[in-house]
Amino acid sequence: VKGPFPADGFFGQGFESKFDAVLGMYHDQVLVPFKSLAMGSGTNFTAGLDIVRTSPDHGTAMHLAGKGKADATSMRNALYTAIDVHHARQAYDEMTKDPLKKQKEKS
């Protein structure tokens, strides 16, 4: 974990390529650089919810609906990410369902 970094300098100098993931505290802080770098293949993930919420980076793309021109890559990535997060949460729940009971230390 590194940072924080100012968004304009971070993306402007290509630092994002040195990391596996970039976390922004605000939606608009990283949306423009994210879309410019990953348009057509990126996935938005909203953390901290009880449900898994992902979406393709292009949003609804209603201007392409019914025209046979949309690229499904970003939608597929969003679905696969949602499935991966769901499975990871299931695995975590399974691993932590029966924790060891705390023992009192002998004095």
Per-segment meaning from a language model:
Residues 1-104:
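Glycine-rich phosphate/nucleotide-binding loop
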